[in-house]
């Protein structure tokens, strides 16, 4: 290596190219590379992975724990990516190796075989493993609602109980950063009783239906009907006459995470791919209209900006994954195609968009 005298000016690296680093394809791993580029588009999560707090949380986890080993391998990738400049790329051999060892004999065994896989399924798997490595538990204390409470007070107490019950077993930076909660209201058309279900999620899946991106979301949370609903309230009222009735389901968002993944329902149950052009225009997003009216969660008023996209090019018979990535320093957009990176004017919407990563905009 050539050494320069201390008095000689050192070459200045272009900070806008720092971290614009590809990931080598290790044999049908483009789905993995696209997913990793999507997750690493979240600066707060990556910053956490490099903190002392991160190290402390893993200290008491056995070294042979598969989730810990995967998370540490991800940390290695983040360190390598953000210490390099375009046109460099990283070789994720250690990360791939840890995942392949972890999935043996599990329902995720397909991730250990060098075959094409689904980036959404891989995203859910990685978030789960990251969470498992650092999760903690706490005591769950139920909020008792007074009979004199009004509907809004009762609903907010039920929501808080639903969320607190979940995080009492699942507290982690992953949940804090990536998880939200939906409320489903099941309305029996016979006795008019409402039953509420609280469902946490780390990716909001929406159909490719409508003229605007807002309509695509609206079609996911629109009312639906079910036949043959086994209503507990009807059974209590007429225990000797147990008859199933119809019911309506109303779905609303109750709370959103600061880092929101939205997955398009591109692949149908018969395996075919929906090739609808995504109508998202790249602008800021607000989800207030999809919230339950009783929700007072602060995320109701948040505005989000797009920071990354996982794209699938091709049909259900085969294809290739790439990622779109907004640089956190320069705010320039890049297409990350395995080892290579190409600058672009802005996010590209089309038939290939599969997973969007939205980040809460700072005020």
Predicted regions mapped to residue ranges:
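Internal amphipathic alpha-helical segments of the cytochrome P450 catalytic fold
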Residues: 45-46, 185, 228, 333
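Exposed substrate/partner-binding surface patches
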Residues: 1-18, 39, 52-53, 57-65, ...
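A broadly conserved sequence feature marking short terminus-proximal activation segments
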Residues: 109-211
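Beta-sheet entry/capping signal
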Residues: 29, 185-187, 259, 322
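USP/UBP deubiquitinase core
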Residues: 2-150, 259-264, 344-352, 357-362
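Processing junctions and N-termini across compartments
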Residues: 24, 182-185, 224-228
């Amino acid at each position: 290596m050539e050494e320069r005298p201390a008095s000689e000016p050192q070459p200045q690296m272009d900070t806008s190219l720092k971290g614009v680093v590809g990931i080598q394809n290790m044999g049908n791993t483009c789905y993995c590379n696209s997913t990793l580029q999507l997750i690493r588009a979240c600066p707060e999560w990556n910053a956490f992975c490099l903190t002392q707090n991160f190290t402390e949380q893993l200290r008491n986890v056995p070294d042979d724990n598969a989730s810990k080993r995967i998370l540490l391998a991800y940390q290695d990738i983040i360190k390598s990516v953000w210490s390099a400049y375009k046109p460099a790329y990283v070789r994720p051999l250690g990360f791939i190796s840890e995942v392949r060892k972890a999935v043996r004999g599990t329902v995720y065994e397909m991730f250990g075989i060098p075959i094409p896989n689904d980036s959404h399924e891989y995203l859910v798997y990685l978030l789960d493993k990251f969470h498992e490595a650092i999760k903690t538990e706490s005591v769950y204390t139920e909020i008792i609602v007074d009979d004199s409470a009004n509907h809004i007070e009762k609903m907010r107490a039920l929501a808080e109980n639903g969320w607190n019950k979940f995080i009492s077993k699942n507290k982690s930076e992953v949940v804090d950063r990536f998880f939200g909660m939906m409320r489903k209201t099941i309305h029996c058309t016979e006795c008019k009783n409402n039953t509420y279900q609280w469902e946490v999620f780390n990716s909001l899946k929406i159909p490719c239906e409508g003229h605007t991106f807002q309509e695509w979301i609206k079609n996911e949370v629109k009312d639906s009907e079910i036949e043959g609903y086994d209503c507990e309230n009807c059974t209590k009222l007429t225990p000797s006459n147990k008859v199933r009735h119809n019911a309506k389901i109303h779905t609303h968002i109750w709370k959103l995470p600061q880092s929101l993944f939205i997955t398009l329902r591109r692949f149908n149950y018969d395996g075919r791919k929906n090739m609808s052009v995504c109508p998202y225009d790249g602008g800021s997003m607000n989800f207030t209209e999809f919230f339950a009216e009783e929700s007072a969660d602060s995320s109701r008023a948040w505005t989000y900006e797009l920071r990354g996209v996982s794209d699938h090019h091709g049909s259900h018979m085969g294809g290739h994954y790439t990622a779109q990535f907004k640089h956190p320093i320069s705010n320039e957009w890049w297409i990350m195609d395995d080892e290579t990176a190409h600058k672009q004017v802005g996010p590209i919407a089309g038939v290939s968009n599969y997973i969007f990563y939205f980040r809460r905009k700072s005020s």
